[in-house]
Amino acid sequence: MKIIGDIVNAETIARGRGIREYALLITRYGGKNWIKRKGIATVEMDGVVSRAEVHWYECHGIGRVKMKVKQWL
């Protein structure tokens, strides 16, 4: 999966201990202030380009991790 361009309408879904995978994120990537976010992006997957709702986790100093497509638009 490759994100083409910017992610628009990004919003926070959960932060800190409100994230189900919070302990896993700290163990695997480090950091403390994790945020789960969602937004709309143009995604290229298997040579097909389409708009999709994507979800990801991010932390200051680490960046975006575990990005996944939740819904094709």
Range-by-range predicted roles:
Residues M1-L73:
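Cysteine-centric segments in proteins
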